[in-house]
C-alpha cells in the first residue's frame, strides 16, 4: 500500500492519510519526544511506510493495552501526529523508534489496508483567548508545578525552568501532564 494524501488535503482543510501506530500504556502529546519499542507486524509496517515518505506517523492510544490485535474500534479517535526522528531495527525483529509529537489530530476514518492501519486524519485546532484570566491560570499552574517539582526529586530542575518559559497555555498543559 502506498502513502496517500486525501482529496480533502488538496483542498487545504488539513486532512490527510497517515499510517497509524497504536500505542499501549502511553499517550504522546505534542512537543513530547519519546522512545517506543514496537514489535507487532502491522505497527512495524506502518513505521516502514512512514519512513518511505515524510516520516509522519499517527500516534493514538489503544483503549485496552492488553489487546494484541486491535481493530479500529479499539483505538481512541484523538491522537498526535508525530515525526519519526530515528528508527533502529533490533536483532530480535522489533524496532526502537524515537518520535516527536507535533500536532493533536482526530481520526476521521480508517482507510482499508491489510498491511497496517491507515487513517484519514484532521488536525485539531487549539483555540484559546489570551485574557487576564487565562494568564492568571497559567501562572497558577506554573507555581503549582514548581511546588510539585520540589517534592518530586525525579523531575530534573531543568524541566521547571523550561515550563516557566512557556507562554502558550496549550503547550504548558501538554508539557506538565507528562510529569
Predicted regions and their residues:
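N-terminal low-complexity, acidic/polar interaction/targeting segments
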Residues: 1-179
Amino acid at each position: 500500500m502506498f502513502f496517500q494524501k486525501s482529496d480533502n488535503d488538496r483542498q487545504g482543510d488539513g486532512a490527510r492519510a497517515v499510517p497509524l501506530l497504536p500505542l499501549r500504556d502511553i499517550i504522546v502529546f505534542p512537543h513530547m519526544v519519546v522512545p517506543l519499542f514496537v514489535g507487532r507486524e502491522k505497527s512495524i509496517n506502518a513505521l516502514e511506510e512512514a519512513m518511505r515518505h515524510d516520516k509522519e506517523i499517527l500516534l493514538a492510544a489503544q483503549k485496552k493495552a492488553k489487546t494484541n490485535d486491535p481493530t479500529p474500534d479499539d483505538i481512541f479517535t484523538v491522537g498526535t501526529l508525530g515525526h519519526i526522528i530515528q528508527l533502529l531495527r533490533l536483532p530480535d525483529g522489533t524496532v526502537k523508534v524515537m518520535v516527536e509529537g507535533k500536532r493533536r489530530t482526530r481520526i476521521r476514518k480508517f482507510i482499508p489496508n491489510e498491511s497496517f492501519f491507515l487513517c484519514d486524519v484532521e488536525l485539531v485546532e487549539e483555540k484559546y483567548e489570551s485574557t487576564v484570566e487565562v494568564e492568571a491560570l497559567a501562572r497558577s499552574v506554573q507555581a503549582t508545578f514548581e511546588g510539585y517539582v520540589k517534592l518530586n526529586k525525579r523531575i530534573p530542575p531543568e524541566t521547571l525552568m523550561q515550563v516557566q518559559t512557556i507562554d502558550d497555555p496549550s503547550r504548558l498543559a501538554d508539557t506538565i501532564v507528562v510529569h
